[in-house]
């Protein structure tokens, strides 16, 4: 089972403050573990334009029609001072890894320098931090009913309002997560 380019959808019983009602986009999953970005936990009072200002990035060819007031996500509890940019191709940036045909993750400054210009990728999600699981840890959490899984959907990843992503991700597999009981059992 490889969950790269899938969503992890927190079950209602998962009460960890970081992962409660979260949707995690899995960027890498292999025999050594998994790495992902939470895509529905906005950081308070931090938007893309604030990140660019803090890093003193002011593109010369700024296009005022491109909005930079999108929220920056808390990508996870690890390396919260490090930026991760999920975006649609191209992957021409210095530190890009293609996750799927339609999704790339970049950690280099050059992608930030394109934001707000005609050169930026068409869809962008900026996060600080990431989540990871050691070998076998995610599989055990799945057996413990901590998560649902669904193939990733770019509309949910990039276009669905943040507050609706948890519910919409569960709908991908036919579940209305708001009607689920808080504790799951084993059959």
Curated annotation (Swiss-Prot):
One of its GO terms (cellular component) is cytosol. Disulfide bonds: none annotated. InterPro entries: AlgH-like (IPR003774). Pfam families: DUF179 (PF02622). It comes from the Bacteria. Belongs to the UPF0301 (AlgH) family. PANTHER family: UNCHARACTERIZED PROTEIN YQGE (PTHR30327), UPF0301 PROTEIN YQGE (PTHR30327:SF1). NCBIfam families: PRK00228.1-1 (NF001266). This is UPF0301 protein YqgE. The gene is yqgE.
């Amino acid at each position: 089972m490889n969950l790269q380019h899938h969503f992890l959808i927190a079950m209602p019983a998962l009460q960890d403050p970081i992962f409660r009602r979260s949707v995690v986009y899995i960027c890498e999953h292999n025999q050594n573990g998994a790495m992902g970005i939470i895509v529905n936990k906005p950081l308070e009072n931090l938007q893309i334009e604030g990140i660019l200002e803090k890093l003193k990035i002011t593109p010369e060819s700024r296009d005022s029609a491109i909005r930079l007031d999108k929220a920056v996500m808390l990508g996870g509890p690890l390396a919260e001072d490090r930026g991760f940019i999920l975006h649609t191709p191209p992957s021409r940036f210095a530190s890009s890894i293609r996750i799927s045909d339609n999704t790339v993750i970049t950690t280099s400054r050059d992608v930030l320098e394109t934001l707000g210009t005609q050169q930026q990728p068409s869809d962008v999600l900026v996060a600080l931090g990431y989540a990871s699981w050691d070998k076998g840890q995610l599989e055990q959490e799945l057996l413990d009913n901590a998560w649902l899984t669904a193939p990733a959907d770019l509309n949910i990843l990039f276009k669905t309002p943040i507050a609706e992503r948890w519910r919409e991700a569960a709908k991908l597999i036919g579940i209305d997560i708001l009607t689920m009981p808080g504790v799951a059992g084993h059959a």
